[in-house]
């Protein structure tokens, strides 16, 4: 048996992030608390450098390395660059929050970078083994980040819930993968797909168990109903800077794992997992939108909102067409942008000794800051799917994909619950514009955050006016 040296070119961004994360961890040991901005600056440099490397190494051809366990293609390039940019925005929004609570530590950024590395591996994995390693690297980083504020009992409780349910989900996913390995004799996603095509065995009992465990494991990780119980507690209990991270970039990696595992690996069983995803999508749309109405805590409201958005993403996947996959990718990218702005606004209104977690904390925001009230209005309208924001076109693309495969009932169901969901978004707008402020203090004047948050909000309307800019990228990245 001859040993071949693998091609390291496709994994250079991963190696760069790994090396920099380890270096930052060591450098942070010697950086005094007053100079903690050095760690922050190096973390941002790492993300920018990784983005440049990924773009520079991008190729129209699909490349494999490490015995076909690692893939670099259009989907991986787009999602990785999106992860870098979203994480850079998350780090920028988080800095004043961490400083005000005396938890401005280098470990936050190091854990974030290791989480990014896990997402990169997930996005480019083409084997059950690499996919699971990337997933666990991300999960372990997130568990630690949720418990980052050690003085908060609520954060520790949320981290424990997240860890226990995350471990159960990982076990189910791993068990499903092990059954697939027993059936096909391979951990390689392409070989699993080839086996299912050539054997023509159909859905036998072992495959039913394998598919069920894989779907349940993925549903847990995505937070789809009925496996969503960790989402509101973790979003509420974690520091807002961590909720911001959990609610944005990992959704991009979650889409990648579905595309690699279900579409690439288990594509021949599409008609079987389509029904499972339909149930998850319907329940997520219904429960997410209805329960969100009863929330007075905006972090819990956005958590249930996330669950309903997962339902839309699953609708694009279950369509099983090129248009459906592109719509799901477009929707996920849009959601990450909008969610970053939403949680960024919560951080903007928070200050030392005060968490702007309740809807009432947004009362009269228009009187305190008309500009940021307008930014929050754009974000809420986009989440509700109001034209001409980009959220409207994201929902429209998914609905078109579902209608094309003659699942008109599902499209009607989604529209009905989108209208239901519009209530709690518009309630937030009403509170900002028509209620009197309880707090008259001016908003913080952190220039970098104010500028980026403004750009973040304006992107919602710019991409809504020119949706083709992002949609063309999403369509080009999908090769199925």
UniProtKB/Swiss-Prot annotation:
Pull one GO CC term from this UniProt entry: plasma membrane
Name the catalysed reactions.
a quinone + NADH + 5 H(+)(in) = a quinol + NAD(+) + 4 H(+)(out)
Q: Which Pfam families does the entry mention? A: Proton_antipo_M (PF00361)
Query: Which GO terms fall under molecular function for this chain's record?
Result: NADH dehydrogenase (ubiquinone) activity; NADH:ubiquinone reductase (non-electrogenic) activity; quinone binding
Q: Which InterPro entries does the annotation name? A: NADH-Q_OxRdtase_suN/2 (IPR010096), ND/Mrp_TM (IPR001750)
Per UniProt, the enzyme's principal EC class comes to: translocase
At the top level, the lineage of the source is Bacteria
Membrane topology term reads: Multi-pass membrane protein
What are the record keywords, sorted? Cell inner membrane, Cell membrane, Membrane, NAD, Quinone, Translocase, Transmembrane, Transmembrane helix, Transport, Ubiquinone
Q: Does the keyword Membrane apply?
A: yes
So what family is this one in? Belongs to the complex I subunit 2 family.
User: NCBIfam families recorded for this chain?
Assistant: NDH_I_N (TIGR01770), PRK05777.1-5 (NF004442)
Purpose: NDH-1 shuttles electrons from NADH, via FMN and iron-sulfur (Fe-S) centers, to quinones in the respiratory chain. The immediate electron acceptor for the enzyme in this species is believed to be ubiquinone. Couples the redox reaction to proton translocation (for every two electrons transferred, four hydrogen ions are translocated across the cytoplasmic membrane), and thus conserves the redox energy in a proton gradient.
The name this protein carries in UniProt is NADH-quinone oxidoreductase subunit N
Which organism does this record belong to? Thioalkalivibrio sulfidiphilus (strain HL-EbGR7)
